[in-house]
């Protein structure tokens, strides 16, 4: 695949809308604008990272201002601050990290979709209050945010980013820094199913959630099919059953059912479709970060070639729900890889990834913004930095 600098801009100019809204139903902004009209049908979006599941590396200053400096995760920070102080601190963060202006800006850049990572503790009835420490009050901000996005005509995916017990060890994206992954047992699956049922009710009964068309049932499970055997045999089929049971009880028309998203087989946790008996409105997700793939040679030519030819999905329909322009830590600030002196390469690599991912159902960049808005991890930063210029 030949990738030119102009290919990035051409791709963005011609593919501007999501597939699910045009396939299944029409959604419009509050003034009647259909962002998905006459589209090529690809999802093109951004993740709202660190809004409801804070990852300290994304915004270390904001993390410190919360009073969380030195803490690994939300769980650790709330335990340190105490519940009342943590609730007040996180409320300020929820009110300021992603605002209505951010949603307007996202739409202005030709994007059509947002993916919102949340933790199961968004439903506070599921928290073990004697042993789990998470901020309270986030749901009101989630509802408001979804209202803004729906008014703007954006499609919304809500992603269970932090699962009960933590789906992987020692990673802040689970909301805690657990020594071992504790999610893969029946009672934790049950808590997650209760979250999905609760979220499904909210989506179908509250106006602000009208553009939520997809629930992702767990983000990035362990990349080991032996560990995730019951995830595939138990949790995934029961997630379908739980969500459809609620929709049946609410008399939701089948065309208005939520899409139910699982990690694609290419992620490495096994085939999510293996035990499904009902895959109506099933969808799949894969995350592609060459930064952490030891099989890929760390060179510009290798990165371009890999991204052009990557087999990023084995199930259909699949969305590449996380990706970036990040490179390994040990080279990211060297002369050959610094972002602002290697713009030509990063533009070509962006185009290579987009062109590949749009052979599937589209992509969602990680993330919308970071503290420094360095464009390799901040889509907003690509506009602030002049990334889209077409000449050196």
Curated annotation (Swiss-Prot):
Entry's EC annotation: 3.2.1.75
PANTHER family assigned: GLUCAN ENDO-1,6-BETA-GLUCOSIDASE B
Active site: 220, 322
Species whose genome carries this gene: Aspergillus flavus (strain ATCC 200026 / FGSC A1120 / IAM 13836 / NRRL 3357 / JCM 12722 / SRRC 167)
Key words, A-Z: Carbohydrate metabolism, Cell wall biogenesis/degradation, Glycoprotein, Glycosidase, Hydrolase, Polysaccharide degradation, Secreted, Signal
Superkingdom assignment: Eukaryota
GO cellular component: cell surface; extracellular region
Tagged with keyword Cell division: no
Protein name, as recorded: Probable glucan endo-1,6-beta-glucosidase B
């Amino acid at each position: 695949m030949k990738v030119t600098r102009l290919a990035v801009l051409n791709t963005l100019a011609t593919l501007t809308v999501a597939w699910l809204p045009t396939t299944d139903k029409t959604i419009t902004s509050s003034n009647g604008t259909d962002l998905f009209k006459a589209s090529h049908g690809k999802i093109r979006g951004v993740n709202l990272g660190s809004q409801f599941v804070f990852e300290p590396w994304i915004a270390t200053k904001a993390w410190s201002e919360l009073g969380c400096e030195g803490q690994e995760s939300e769980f650790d920070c709330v335990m340190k601050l105490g519940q009342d102080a943590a609730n007040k601190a996180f409320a300020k963060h929820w009110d300021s990290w992603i605002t209505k202006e951010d949603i307007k800006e996202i739409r202005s850049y030709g994007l059509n979709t947002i993916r919102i990572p949340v933790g199961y503790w968004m439903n506070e009835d599921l928290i073990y209050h004697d042993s789990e420490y998470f901020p309270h009050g986030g749901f009101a901000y989630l509802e408001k945010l979804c209202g803004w996005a729906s008014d703007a005509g954006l499609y919304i995916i809500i992603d269970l980013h932090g699962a009960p017990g933590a789906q992987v060890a020692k990673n802040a994206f689970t909301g805690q820094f657990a020594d071992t992954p504790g999610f893969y047992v029946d009672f934790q699956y049950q808590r997650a199913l209760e979250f999905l049922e609760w979220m499904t009710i909210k989506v179908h009964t509250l106006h602000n959630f009208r553009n939520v068309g997809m629930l992702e049932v767990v983000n990035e499970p362990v990349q080991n099919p032996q560990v995730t055997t019951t995830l595939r045999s138990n949790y995934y089929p029961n997630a379908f059953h739980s969500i459809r049971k609620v929709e049946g009880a609410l008399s939701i028309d089948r065309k208005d059912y939520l899409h139910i998203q699982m990690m694609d087989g290419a992620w490495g946790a096994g085939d999510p479709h293996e035990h499904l008996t009902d895959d109506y409105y099933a969808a799949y997700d894969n995350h592609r970060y060459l930064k952490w793939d030891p099989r890929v040679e760390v060179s510009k030519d290798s990165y371009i070639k890999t991204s052009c030819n990557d087999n990023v999905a084995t199930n259909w329909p699949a969305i590449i729900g996380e990706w970036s322009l990040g490179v390994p830590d040990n080279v990211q600030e060297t002369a050959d890889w610094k972002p602002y002196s290697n713009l030509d390469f990063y533009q070509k690599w962006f185009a290579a990834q987009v062109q590949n991912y749009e052979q599937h159902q589209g992509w969602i960049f990680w993330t919308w913004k970071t503290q420094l808005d360095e464009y390799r991890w901040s889509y907003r930063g690509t506009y602030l930095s002049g990334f889209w210029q077409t000449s050196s």
